[in-house]
From Swiss-Prot:
A biological-process GO annotation: chaperone cofactor-dependent protein refolding
Pfam families per UniProt: Cpn10
InterPro entries associated with the record: Chaperonin_GroES, Chaperonin_GroES_sf, Chaprnonin_Cpn10_CS, GroES-like_sf
Molecular function per GO: ATP binding; metal ion binding; protein folding chaperone; protein-folding chaperone binding; unfolded protein binding
Protein name as catalogued: Co-chaperonin GroES
Family annotation (CDD domains): cpn10
Assigned protein family: Belongs to the GroES chaperonin family.
Cellular component terms per the entry's GO annotation: cytoplasm
Listed SUPFAM superfamilies: GroES-like
Length: 96
C-alpha cells in the first residue's frame, strides 16, 4: 500500500529500539513502554490558510520526530509493519 497523505498529514514509521532492564535483561516489546519517536516517510502538501494559500510543511521526509502517545491513526505497510498517519500539529519536536 502506497500512502500519500493529504493536506497537513504526515506518515511516520515508529522507531523500535530493544531495551534492557536496569539488570541487563532484554525486555520484550509487550513489557516496554512505546517510544513516541519515529521517522517521517511521507508528507502532505500543507495546510490551507483562510485566504486559500497553502502553508508549507515544517517536517520533511527523513526527519526524526517525537509525537504524542495517542497521536495519529495506525495503519500497516506492505510488510505488515505499523505506520502512524497524523497531523503535523501532533508532532511535538524534530529530533536531531
Amino acid at each position: 500500500m502506497n500512502i500519500k497523505p493529504l493536506h497537513d498529514r504526515v506518515v511516520v514509521r515508529q522507531v523500535e529500539e530493544q531495551k534492557e532492564s536496569t539488570g541487563g535483561i532484554l525486555l520484550p516489546g509487550s513489557a516496554q513502554e512505546k517510544e513516541n519517536l519515529g521517522e517521517v516517510v511521507a508528507v502532505g502538501p500543507g495546510k490551507a490558510a483562510d485566504n486559500g494559500s497553502i502553508i508549507p510543511m515544517t517536517v520533511k521526509v527523513g526527519d526524526k520526530v517525537m509525537f504524542g502517545q495517542y497521536s495519529g491513526q495506525e495503519v500497516k505497510d506492505d510488510a505488515g509493519k505499523p505506520l502512524k498517519v497524523m497531523r503535523e500539529d501532533d508532532i511535538i519536536a524534530i529530533v536531531e
